[in-house]
Amino acid sequence: MGTKNTLLDGAMTLNGDVFYYKYQNYQISQIVDRTSVNLNFNATVKGAEMEATWEPVPGLRFNFAGGYENTRLANGSQAIDLIDRTAGNPNWMVVRPFITETSNCILPTAVINQLLSSFRAANHGNNSTSAAYSSSGGFEDGLEFQGDAIPLLQACYQAYSQGVDPVTNHTYMANPGTDYFGNPLTDGYAGFNPATAPNSGEGIMKNLSGNQLPNAPPFTLSAGTQYSMPLSTDWAGTARVDGYWQGNSFARVFNDKPYDQLHGYTNVNLSLIFTNQDGWQAMAYVKNMFDTTAITGAFLNSDDTGLSTNVFTTDPRLFGLRITKNW
């Protein structure tokens, strides 16, 4: 719903509108297992826009536009965050499988701790070394493995492809007495049933209710000023400056700070335009006058890339000259 108005004997136009959209199964893409997968959410988008132009004297013109947009995911929206598969739950840890596997998995912290304890006990004194995840979530060098040991790199495959407890290499058994090596379990290990893992070990759903849609800054502003005047009987010139500003937004639907946050930025442009009655036009311009570098969007890649992120930025400062002829 909107309104369009002409004011001040035609010297000013003032337009405005309000809007409300309700989406079902709004699609947002992310990379999973090297494939683009659509996540579907219900969402609402509402806001208001205003634009105005004013020419107080012949040749001098001002323009302004502003927008407010409120975007929200519906209650009950949820998804697995690939860079935070445990959703901050300390009882679970992210494990990277073999390099040939495309996706990480999650395993209970108790399973990881018991595997590390069993490996150390079974391989005490062995000279062969490798590296595995430590209980603190990083890498620990110097863990000693025998040739038939089960490294943590296999734990995801064992749990979610074979359906066995990685500690025992057998189907779930409550309070198992021994580990894979036949050594007694002394740490009070209760056993792990892979069937009970959240979402088959892919991760824990995050509650996204009320989160903003990606690349939807709540506030945007633009303004410009130009002055046109005759230079001779054949030529006219126009000088113009315009700017654009947008507030903070998010690159992903998870709205994780600071990773997902896209900071607001300002962009200013200048131009000089010369035209004549024969259809020639010459324009000299500067885009992004202050050489502002801002990230305007980001795209998260899959686990096997190390969860690398592609970012999109504003163009650098650009000087240009354009000559055109119209017939």
Region roles according to the model:
Residues 1, 46-50, 219-223, 266-270, ...:
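Hydrophobic, lipid-facing positions within transmembrane beta-strands of outer-membrane proteins
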Residues 7-9, 22, 54-60, 229-233, ...:
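Outer-membrane beta-barrel strand-turn architecture
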Residues 2-6, 51-53, 65, 226-228, ...:
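Transmembrane beta-barrel domains of outer membrane proteins
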Residues 20, 39-253:
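Gram-negative outer-membrane beta-barrel transporters
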Residues 71, 243-254, 258, 273-327:
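C-terminal beta-signal and adjacent terminal beta-strands/loops
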